[in-house]
Swiss-Prot record:
Domain B5: 402-477
Domain of life: Bacteria
Name by which UniProt lists this protein: Phenylalanine--tRNA ligase beta subunit
Species this chain originates from: Buchnera aphidicola subsp. Schizaphis graminum (strain Sg)
GO molecular function, one term: tRNA binding
Any one GO CC term of the record: phenylalanine-tRNA ligase complex
Domain tRNA-binding: 39-148
Catalytic activity: tRNA(Phe) + L-phenylalanine + ATP = L-phenylalanyl-tRNA(Phe) + AMP + diphosphate + H(+)
Length: 798
């Protein structure tokens, strides 16, 4: 919402600077998005009076004027404006004055007639682009006065605020003024009476034919209005700052009331309403044609306002094009309606939001509806004339639309919340300034929030509301009363674990990304087949209608997006929650913290010293081993080849930590690769961090001063036996000794009948207390080979 500071000061004018006023708006919980100064400088622009207006040629609009601007002689000016006439006061740009667009006024001939200045419209002043008629000033403004001195063009500031859904009071001048009054402990804002007497008895009967919907409806007929009049300048200026100014007087009046008191109103052509107003649910396939000839087919859950034969409008001021008033309309129907938020949500599913729907989504104060009707009537009749009919009212389930929460606020809870003492009299005064109804007892208050605060539901809401007026800066800073000692063994290490992993991956060339937890269910089905999806009841769209079971869909979507933008080498990782069905959990849903990554395309950038190659399984496996080495230790995890749905059957594996499954890695399945238009070299990994409960803590020890002793062996073993199983047995055998085991050769040939493979394994022995003797090393190695022969039927090659 945008507004100008002078408009706000018409409602509440504390003796503080503009900067302080803006700071108080922020302190009240309303964010200021932008501030712009309005300080027009119109040198040489004077108030003049047309004393003579001659039209020498009837076929031409040009008029020859004599204008008095307070000089010794009258100015000759040529003007073509349609509203140019004798005895009106105007704005005159004199010779050598400069227009806002940079043009300089000079003496010139127009149609052989000398012109010594320009009669200005708002358009020439750079204010209202569609106002091409010359400005007509009030009669009481003296001739020759500089227009910079006019009140209507004085310096001002316009402010744009952003309002959260829980603060509808910030969507109007009235709401902001109430907050400023409370902060400065000023008198409550009182609404001026705007009631005009009725002069006719005409009205439309109103019926509500829906039991489930909550509706509060006001309507009034106003006859014999003149909608061909110009909008008053004071209203134009305010709406200009709000970016809501139009050339339609009805739109301007409705927007003025919307910004000033936060009440949406609607106006229809009364002559086209057939006898009655009926509020009902739409009939299947019923439609509405809008002003731009757009046709909207309505569902049965859409609330409509109709007459006997047609729909008039639906909530959000989405009107039937036939009912829109124009400048020739003489009789209008002024309405105010309030419906429940469910009705608004049903409409938002069907069409895009607009300014009026935004107000209804935030919440509208039901207690101001009648006042808004009276205020709009007052403005319409004062500006456009007309005869006023009575206000007709109809309500259904009104209690659900009004704010009537009774909340118990304990003094002790308030002080405990801020860990300080605030006297009960101060709290009571703030509550009264905020216009709560208060019943005070010895230890607590019964409070009733004002009608415009729909967000105040519980005691903590009231405490927060009091504190924004009390000012958080007034709460003293106090140290913790208790010393806390954290045991690293019991402390939750998931956050530092993630940070440690993130730093390592970034150092290896990965970029961290953040994707939505809501994803497209069809994409999830492709990547994770045969899954139980968690679908969202009211999704933003179909692409965001399922909770993610894995980080992979988001990672692959990011790779696809970047590939389509000429990126040839990509490494991404993400950390976030994934969700799955688990009846043993609260709400039947389990959430786990996952870490996932993807590599795709070329391994490195193009260079002169090596041939570019695409990434492969072992590139990802190497990154993952480095990661697991940091977070849980190299000896604790295993990577086992297993088929995984969504991954290539020959290039996929599962990761185990202490024999518990914690994740997967592998190449994306060719079908998915083709569907997502990915490189033929895309590899993924994912780790569940719920099982990784602690970081690896390193123990330091002295380096042995004794030399190492190395032995190499070559063994024949079945191709079906993974090397991981062999090295695990060897490590278990040497668990209490310092032995480093490494695979340095793999060999296979026809001599082995293609059923066996030869493995070259090195053993490096070392002792911290003595120099190992040859027979000791040979004996340990002999015993290890003996176990391998027994368990895997290995044959020692010579």
């Amino acid at each position: 919402m945008k507004f100008n500071e002078n408009w706000l000061r018409e409602w509440i004018n504390p003796k503080i600077t503009s900067v302080s006023l803006r700071n108080q708006i922020v302190e009240s919980g309303i964010e200021i998005e932008s501030i712009h100064e309005f300080n027009p400088i119109f040198d040489g622009f004077l108030v003049g009076k047309i004393v003579e207006c001659i039209n020498p040629c009837k076929g031409n609009n040009l008029k020859i004027l004599k204008v008095d601007v307070g000089y010794k002689k009258l100015l000759n000016i040529v003007c073509g404006a349609s509203n140019c006439r004798n005895n009106i006061k105007v704005v005159v740009a004199t010779i050598d004055s400069i227009l806002p667009n940079g043009s300089k006024i000079k003496i010139k001939k127009i149609k052989e007639k000398l012109s010594e200045g320009m009669i200005c419209s708002f358009f020439e002043l750079g204010l209202f682009n569609f106002c091409k008629d010359i400005i007509e000033l009030p009669e009481d403004i003296p001739i020759g006065k500089k227009i910079n001195d006019l009140f209507l063009l004085k310096k001002d500031t316009f402010i744009k605020v952003a309002v959260t859904p829980n603060r509808p009071d910030g969507l109007s001048i009235l709401g902001i003024a109430r907050n400023i009054a409370a902060i400065n402990n000023l008198k409550k804002i009182r609404l001026k009476k705007r009631i005009l007497p009725t002069t006719i008895e005409d009205q439309f009967p109103i019926t509500i034919n829906t039991e489930k919907q909550s509706v509060n409806y006001f309507g009034r007929i106003i006859q014999n209005v003149n909608l061909n009049v110009d909008t008053p300048f004071w209203m134009k200026k305010k709406l200009f700052f709000c970016d809501l100014l139009s050339d339609n007087i009805i739109e301007n009046i409705l927007n003025y009331i919307l910004i000033e008191i936060g009440q949406p109103l609607n106006i229809l052509n009364a002559d086209k309403i057939d006898d009655v107003i009926e509020i009902r649910m739409a009939i299947k396939k019923e439609f509405l044609i809008l002003k731009n000839d757009t046709r909207i087919v309505l569902d049965k859950d859409i609330l409509v306002f109709s007459d006997k034969t047609k729909i008039l409008f639906i909530p959000g001021n989405i009107n039937n094009s036939d009912l829109e008033p124009n400048k020739n309309t003489k009789n209008i129907f002024l309405t105010s309606y309030l419906v429940d938020k469910k009705s608004i949500l049903n409409i938002l599913k069907k069409i895009d939001s607009n300014n009026i729907l935004d107000y209804y989504s935030h919440g509208v104060d039901a207690s101001l509806q009648k006042y808004a009707i009276e205020y709009a009537t007052y403005l319409i009749v004062k500006i456009c004339g007309g005869k006023i009919g009575p206000i007709n009212t109809k309500k259904s389930n009104f209690n659900s639309l009004s704010c009537s929460n009774k909340i118990k606020l304990y003094h002790q809870n308030f002080n405990k919340c801020i860990d300080s003492f605030v006297d009960s009299s101060i709290i009571s005064n703030i509550l009264l300034c905020l216009e709560y109804k208060v019943n005070f007892h010895k230890k607590y208050w019964y409070v009733f929030p004002p009608s415009w605060r729909f967000d105040i539901l519980i005691e903590e809401d009231v405490i927060g509301d009091i504190l924004r007026i009390y000012n958080y800066n007034n709460i003293p800073l106090t140290p913790l009363k208790q010393n806390y000692y954290f045991n690293s063994k019991n402390k939750d290490l998931k956050s530092p674990l993630l940070d440690e992993a993130a730093v390592l991956l970034i150092n290896r060339g990965y970029y961290e990304i953040i994707t939505y937890s809501f994803i497209n269910p069809s994409l999830q089905d492709d990547i994770i087949p045969n899954n139980n999806q968690i679908l969202i009841s009211n999704p933003i769209s179909k692409d965001f209608s399922s909770m993610r079971l894995s980080l992979w869909p988001g990672l692959l979507k990011t790779v696809s997006y970047n590939k389509n933008r000429q990126q040839e080498s990509m490494r991404f990782f993400e950390r976030g929650l994934c969700f799955s069905i688990d009846e043993s959990q609260i709400l039947g849903i389990r959430q786990e913290m996952f870490l996932g990554g993807v590599i795709s395309g070329f391994y490195s950038k193009e260079n002169w010293f090596s041939v570019r190659r695409k990434v492969d399984f072992y590139d990802l496996k190497g990154d993952l081993e480095s990661l697991l080495e940091v977070i849980c230790g190299l000896n604790k995890f295993e990577i086992r080849h297993q088929n995984i749905l969504g991954l290539h059957p020959e290039q996929s594996a599962k990761i185990y930590l202490d024999n518990k499954y914690i994740g997967s890695l592998g190449k994306i399945h060719p079908k998915i690769e083709k569907k997502l238009n990915l490189y033929n070299s895309t590899f993924l990994f994912e780790l569940s961090l719920n099982y990784i409960s602690k970081l690896k803590f390193y123990n330091t020890e002295e380096i042995s001063k004794y030399p190492t002793s190395r032995r190499d062996i070559a063994i024949l073993v079945s191709k079906d036996i993974p090397f991981l199983d062999i090295i695990t047995v060897c490590k278990d055998f040497f668990v209490n000794k310092k032995v480093e085991i490494n695979l340095f050769d793999v060999y296979s040939c026809k001599e082995f009948d293609n059923r066996k493979k030869s493995l070259g394994i090195s053993f490096v022995f070392q002792n911290f207390k003595k120099n190992l003797k040859e027979n000791e090393v040979n004996l340990m190695l002999h015993d290890c080979i003996k176990i391998l022969k027994k368990k895997f039927q290995v044959v020692l090659r010579k």
